[in-house]
Curated annotation (Swiss-Prot):
GO terms for biological process: defense response to bacterium. InterPro entries: Defensin_beta-like. Has antibacterial activity against the Gram-positive bacterium S.aureus 1056 MRSA (MIC=2.78 ug/ml) and the Gram-negative bacterium E.coli O157:H7 (MIC=2.41 ug/ml). Does not have antifungal activity against the yeast C.albicans 3153A. The lineage of its organism: Eukaryota, Metazoa, Chordata, Craniata, Vertebrata. Its main location: secreted. Pfam families: Defensin_beta. This is Ostricacin-3. Keywords: Antibiotic, Antimicrobial, Defensin, Disulfide bond, Secreted. Disulfide bonds join C8-C36, C15-C30, C20-C37. It is found in: Secreted. It comes from Struthio camelus. The keyword Secreted applies. The keyword Secreted applies. Coiled coil: none annotated. GO terms for cellular component: extracellular region.
Amino acid sequence: IPRPLDPCIAQNGRCFTGICRYPYFWIGTCRNGKSCCRRR
């Protein structure tokens, strides 16, 4: 059974601890409380 995708990952984002750094920008929060970042 595939586990449900994090909404962040579904939006092509990645979960980072702390702030997003270039070339990523913040698009939300992951389920685990980390920052959801996506490439520009």
